[in-house]
């Protein structure tokens, strides 16, 4: 699994990012050291996957747009670092299955719940992929918000990374007694996004 390579890269990148960026991490609680969970984050820039990895002590796997894997070298590198491809704008069953396998194997994975980067800086409508994996695996979902404070066009502007408490299967509105439905997935996605939005409003006030 290239675990040693992942954590060696993580240590190097932490040093680089501390020199380049100003960022604050807010943790609502200590996250589990064992067992699987899903990190559901908003998506502002190409540095977001790096900030997710830096702020979690455990190894993190994440979905990345399929286009990034067209370059064999770069695609191979990010695969070693935990990325797996997802086709945006499509119901990518293979990516969902890969995510479920990782969660069932006790891993931690990240999903950018909006399905892509925002062009305006505002939050977008959540996609259902995170809710689908949470429903199928019963894994808790950790809402996370990355907020740029100040001038959003400044790539080195201060960031606040806000990591929330895990939302349980029941807190997401899922039930063992019912077959999953699109409405159920939409409601779970809304609950997750509501937390992300709450963090964003709090953290935008941080000057």
Regions found by a protein language model. Name each.
Residues 32-90, 98:
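Catalytic core of membrane glycerolipid acyltransferases/transacylases, capturing the structured
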Residues 1-38, 47-51, 56, 80-82, ...:
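Membrane-anchoring hydrophobic helices of lipid-metabolizing enzymes
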Residues 4, 8, 91, 184, ...:
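Soluble or luminal CAZymes and related metallo-dependent hydrolases
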Residues 94-207:
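Non-catalytic C-terminal accessory region of glycerolipid acyltransferases
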Residues 27, 64-65, 82, 112-114, ...:
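A secondary-structure boundary/capping signal
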Residues 29, 66, 87, 145, ...:
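Residues at the C-termini of beta-strands that transition into short coil/loop
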Residues 2, 63-64, 88-89, 119-120, ...:
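A generic secondary-structure micro-motif detector
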Residues 13, 52, 75, 130-134:
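Short amphipathic alpha-helical segments and helix-helix/interface helices
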